[in-house]
Amino acid sequence: MVSFTSLLAAFSVVSGVLTSPIAVVPEVNTALAKRTPSSTGTSGGFYYSFWTDTPNSVTYTNGDAGKFSVSWKNNNGNHVGGKGWRTGSARTIKYSGSYKPNGNSYLAIYGWTRSPLIEYYIVESFGTYNPSTGATSKGQFTVDGSVYDLYTSTRTNAPSIEGTRTFTQFWSVRRTKRTSGSVNTGAHFAAWKKAGMNLGSHDYQILAVEGYKSSGSATMTVS
């Protein structure tokens, strides 16, 4: 099976099947701003990004501070969204909440870099599809209480934060799934560099829930 990330690329473009980046909008404290499909902006002091090609099947809601929720049922398309930072860095990211996928879905730290153009995932949990399928193994390392397997894959002429491009995906996939904890992104970046996986200059970085042709729900808080 082809990973749904191979069908979608990033959400500011917005993770995977996007055609063009969506402009950042200022924070607005209204119910409309809290439930806006296919948008990016700020909410509760955090950057957020959400995209879906099936708005009638999925609902994304921004909560206070770093909280967000997403629910989807019999979704025949794709969706991805979450909260984090407009500019990524080697920060420690704390998160907690409820993640209940039924089918193909990821819970991950997700981001992009430029020069080189890299799309990256630190996968903390997933549904029925393991993202390592079809990817190239680059080793493993241990951090935050678990072994993570490292992989790379290539996207050819795919949507990205720089338009349609060919680029590399970096993956860290946690062996022991979890829905709360701390992610030392700096340790992942160092392990990737040691494995010859070199990042560029950081673009956005979020805790994301992604789904493809599945059902499920999640309520997460990031800090």
From Swiss-Prot:
Q: Which reaction is recorded as catalysed by this protein? A: Endohydrolysis of (1->4)-beta-D-xylosidic linkages in xylans
Q: Where is the active site?
A: E119, E210
Q: Where is this region: Nuclear localization signal?
A: 174-184
Identify the coding gene. Answer: EIX1
Q: Which top class of enzyme applies to this chain? A: hydrolase
Q: What is this protein called?
A: Ethylene-inducing xylanase 1
Q: Name one GO cellular component term.
A: host cell nucleus
Q: Which residues form the GH11 domain?
A: 34-223
Signal peptide segment: 1-19
Which effects follow disruption of this gene? Decreases virulence during cotton plant infection.
Similarity comment: Belongs to the glycosyl hydrolase 11 (cellulase G) family.
Q: Which UniProt keywords apply?
A: Carbohydrate metabolism, Glycosidase, Host nucleus, Hydrolase, Polysaccharide degradation, Secreted, Signal, Virulence, Xylan degradation
- State a single Gene Ontology molecular function: endo-1,4-beta-xylanase activity
Q: Which EC number(s) does UniProt give?
A: 3.2.1.8
Query: Where in the cell does this protein reside?
Result: Secreted; Host nucleus
What pathway is this protein a component of?
A: Glycan degradation; xylan degradation
BP terms from Gene Ontology: effector-mediated perturbation of host innate immune response by symbiont; xylan catabolic process
Protein role: Endo-1,4-beta-xylanase involved in the hydrolysis of xylan, a major structural heterogeneous polysaccharide found in plant biomass representing the second most abundant polysaccharide in the biosphere, after cellulose. Acts as an effector that localizes to the host nucleus to contribute to the virulence process. Induces host innate immunity responses; triggers BAK1-and SOBIR1-dependent cell death, salicylic acid signaling and jasmonic acid signaling. Does not exhibit any cell death when transiently expressed in N.benthamiana.
Q: Fetch the InterPro entries from UniProt.
A: ConA-like_dom_sf, GH11/12, GH11_AS_1, GH11_dom, Glyco_hydro_11
PROSITE patterns registered for this protein in UniProt: GH11_1, GH11_3
Organism from which the protein derives: Verticillium dahliae (strain VdLs.17 / ATCC MYA-4575 / FGSC 10137) (Verticillium wilt)
